[in-house]
Amino acid sequence: MNGVFLAIGALLPICLAGGALLGYAAVRFRVQGDPVAEQVNALLPQTQCGQCGYPGCKPYAEAIAAGDKINKCPPGGEATIRALADLLDLEPEPLDAAEETPPRVAYIREAECIGCTKCIQACPVDAIVGAARLMHTVIADECTGCDLCLEPCPVDCIEMRETPDDVRHWKWPQPSPRLIASDRERAA
């Protein structure tokens, strides 16, 4: 009986020290959030537009980290899809869009604008400039075409317009493989 108390007395301090060490390590080396979701979120464009089907970029990043598709972000486009594929070691996929829509930007009819600033507050990328009770305008190069400024406008003076074709978003048609092969044969 005396040996049992001796064994308990010897093991109890060792167990308490080990438990305290594990408790300290759990607090000291705790990982905040999901590191993969944080890395994915850093690659997304942070427009918070909801075009991916999620209420913002962070929920979409968490969904990607949980296994959702990486090709649902129209503002990020192909460059974001390639970066996400490299990060997650996946194959890049084409952008998942219901139909290919031309790029659009918001346009404010300044004569109708009352300067309420609701569109400025709604814009996730600060592409709208103006001041209270003064007309507002859109910086077209900054606008992602997310449509978030349309809803809060009380006088409906904002519309989405297609951007004119220029070198920034011009798409050349892909050559057909047959044409390329025939050109090689003629050159040889």
From Swiss-Prot:
Residues binding [4Fe-4S] cluster 1: C49, C52, C57, C73
Gene Ontology terms, MF aspect: 4 iron, 4 sulfur cluster binding; electron transfer activity; metal ion binding
Domain 4Fe-4S ferredoxin-type: 104-133, 134-163
Keywords noted in UniProt: 4Fe-4S, Cell inner membrane, Cell membrane, Electron transport, Iron, Iron-sulfur, Membrane, Metal-binding, Repeat, Translocase, Transport
Binding locations of [4Fe-4S] cluster 2: C113, C116, C119, C153
Gene Ontology biological process terms from the UniProt entry: electron transport chain
Hydrophobic as annotated region, ranges: 1-26
GO cellular component, one term: plasma membrane
Cofactor(s) required for function per UniProt: [4Fe-4S] cluster
Domain 4Fe-4S, first and last residues per copy: 32-90
Cell location: Cell inner membrane
SUPFAM superfamilies (UniProt xref): 4Fe-4S ferredoxins
InterPro entries xref list: 4Fe-4S_dom (IPR007202), 4Fe4S_Fe-S-bd (IPR017896), 4Fe4S_Fe_S_CS (IPR017900), Elect_transpt_cplx_RnfB/RsxB (IPR010207), RnfB/RsxB_Proteobac (IPR016463), RnfB_subfamily (IPR050294)
Bound cofactor: record note: Binds 3 [4Fe-4S] clusters.
Binding site for [4Fe-4S] cluster 3: C123, C143, C146, C149
EC number assigned by the record: 7.-.-.-
Protein family per UniProt: Belongs to the 4Fe4S bacterial-type ferredoxin family. RnfB subfamily.
Subunit structure: The complex is composed of six subunits: RnfA, RnfB, RnfC, RnfD, RnfE and RnfG.
The protein's role, per its UniProt record: Part of a membrane-bound complex that couples electron transfer with translocation of ions across the membrane.
Full protein name: Ion-translocating oxidoreductase complex subunit B
Lineage: Bacteria, Pseudomonadati, Pseudomonadota, Gammaproteobacteria, Pseudomonadales
